[in-house]
UniProtKB/Swiss-Prot annotation:
This is Elongation factor 1-gamma. Residues 2-84 form the GST N-terminal domain. It comes from Artemia salina (Brine shrimp). GO terms for molecular function: translation elongation factor activity. Residues 232-255, 269-278 have a biased composition (Basic and acidic residues). EF-1 is composed of four subunits: alpha, beta, delta, and gamma. Residues 271-430 form the EF-1-gamma C-terminal domain.
């Protein structure tokens, strides 16, 4: 009897394939309790056995290592699940491949933004829905006269396709969308109610209302994953502010051969800068950014007010809406960094100083922004609208003393927030 250790994180639908197969075959699978995704699978010991660092990964009791979820499921299955003839074996492989090529990519494109782990793209999601429709219709036609995908019993084909459909049926395939696929629904419900399947996935609830992309959830996820990245040098609170280092223009990196995705992006027409429709005015954003980077604030702030063109540029105050949910300060900083990365194309015509005030579990995020135009700039492009709704925005009067005080505070990284929390860290968008 097959026995061994399965490395995976909780609720991994890919690992479900092997775990369900083991329920049918009697294979003894032990889930590695000490496994920590992002740490264990990056360790030298793990990479020695599984060079790509992917999970699920399986190590048999006699020391053999197997990667890739379908291969692991096949290994721990019995002959009934694998097919009773060469034809059935081939048909099972066909449906396993169908799941990986026709369902999984489109499922990820549609569902992952809903879960907050991938950025939403309207066109890509529309294509994904069309692809899922085609895949479900193919399944529905095949199951019109069949109880299972291959033969008269449950096989790996049913297990693998069911596991690949779990996220869709859980998060986005509401009743209105799935009602056209009567045979597929019947088959799916039959599978998830098998005792061997329920032993792994538990009680499964079909989607009632299709999930939607939530910018706040996405921003929080980006902050969480960004916490493991190497921190960039940041300014720290100080009595005497050190002169900022001069920002050098990086040399062009050595070019590498572009992959298919890069080639496709390169082939797309260049997008037009939304700011081009607005008057340029007299304020030279690049000039101010250079002056700010190379001079103390005692010089750069007066320089800002001397050059600022209030007729063609505006100043805004931003405040993060969900401050009671902020935890670690470094995660708050990652929220800011993530937003800056996602609005990269605004950088040429905008400047911002965004600060974290307070300490762990008692902090706030707020900032001062300057950009060309008199309206909220994020509405100019769908690409800039991922994060801004997580903030309250207030347009400031450039002639008001309150505005001048705020600009000084945020450009010098000093003072407190509205609740009296002291400045902790700041980031500059320039």
């Amino acid at each position: 009897m097959v026995a061994g250790k399965l490395y995976t994180y909780p609720e991994n639908f890919r690992a479900f394939k092997a775990l369900i197969a083991a329920q049918y075959s009697g294979a003894k699978l032990e889930i590695a309790k000490s496994f920590v995704f992002g740490e264990t699978n990056k360790s030298d010991a793990f990479l020695k056995s599984f060079p790509l660092g992917k999970v699920p990964a399986f190590e048999s009791a006699d020391g053999h290592c197997i990667a890739e979820s379908n291969a692991i499921a096949y290994y721990v299955a019995n002959e009934t699940l694998r097919g009773s003839s060469d034809l059935e074996k081939a048909q099972i492989i066909q449906w396993m491949t169908f799941a990986d090529t026709e369902i999984l990519p489109a499922s990820c494109t549609w569902v992952f933004p809903v879960l907050g782990i991938m950025q939403f793209n309207k066109q890509a999601t529309a294509r994904a829905k069309e692809d899922i429709d085609k895949a479900l219709q193919a399944l529905d036609d095949h199951l019109l006269t069949r109880t299972y995908l291959v033969g008269e019993r449950i096989t790996l084909a049913d297990i693998v396709v069911t596991c690949t459909l779990l996220h869709l049926y859980q998060h986005v395939l509401d009743e209105a969308f799935r009602k056209s696929y009567v045979n597929t629904n019947r088959w799916f419900i039959t599978l998830i109610n098998q005792k061997q399947v329920k032993a792994v996935i538990g009680d499964f609830k079909l989607c009632e209302k299709a999930g939607e992309f939530d910018p706040k959830k996405y921003a929080e996820f980006q902050a969480a994953i960004g916490s493991g990245e190497k921190k960039k040098t940041e300014k720290a609170p100080k009595a005497v502010k050190a002169k900022p280092e001069k920002k050098e223009v990086p040399k062009k990196e050595q070019e590498e051969p572009a992959d298919a995705a890069e080639e496709a992006l390169a082939a797309e027409p260049k997008s037009k800068d939304p700011f081009d429709e607005m008057p340029k005015g007299t304020f030279n954003m690049d000039d101010f950014k250079r002056f700010y980077s190379n001079n103390e604030e005692t010089k750069s702030i007066p320089y800002f007010w001397e050059k600022f063109d209030k007729e063609n540029y505006s100043i805004w105050y931003s405040e993060y809406k969900y401050q009671d949910e902020l935890a670690k300060v470094y995660m708050s900083c990652n929220l800011i960094t993530g937003m800056f990365q996602r609005i990269e194309k605004m950088r040429k015509q905008a400047f911002a100083s965004v600060c974290v005030f307070g300490e762990d579990n008692d902090s706030s995020i707020s900032g001062i922004w300057v950009w060309r135009g008199q309206d909220l700039a994020f509405k100019l492009s769908p690409d800039w609208q991922i994060d801004y709704e997580s903030y309250d925005w207030k347009k400031l009067d450039p002639d008001a003393q309150e505005t001048k005080d705020l600009v000084t505070q945020y450009f010098t990284w000093t003072g407190t927030d509205k609740q009296g929390r002291k400045f902790n860290q700041g980031k500059i968008f320039k």
